[in-house]
């Protein structure tokens, strides 16, 4: 049986709230969300971030788990060395 330990995402959620409040251009926002999600090595970080963003900011679209994984891939492809 595979049991996962509960993971604390409060720091990630706080970083996401700060990004949403910063009123960044969309491309920069997506890159920064990718940075925040890529900083978490746990499996399920993109899903947790997606659920949080969709619940907290229901008027904003584009935060599905698949899109957050794409944001992470975008950040990892174009991050500054």
Regions found by a protein language model. Name each.
Residues 1-81:
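Basic, low-complexity intrinsically disordered segments
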């Amino acid at each position: 049986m595979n049991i996962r330990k509960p993971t604390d995402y409060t720091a990630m959620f706080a970083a996401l709230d700060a990004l949403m409040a910063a009123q960044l251009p969309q491309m920069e926002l997506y890159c920064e969300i990718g940075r925040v999600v890529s900083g978490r090595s746990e499996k399920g970080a993109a899903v947790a971030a997606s659920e949080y963003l969709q619940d907290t900011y229901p008027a904003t679209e584009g935060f599905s788990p698949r899109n957050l994984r794409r944001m992470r891939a975008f950040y990892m492809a174009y991050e500054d060395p």
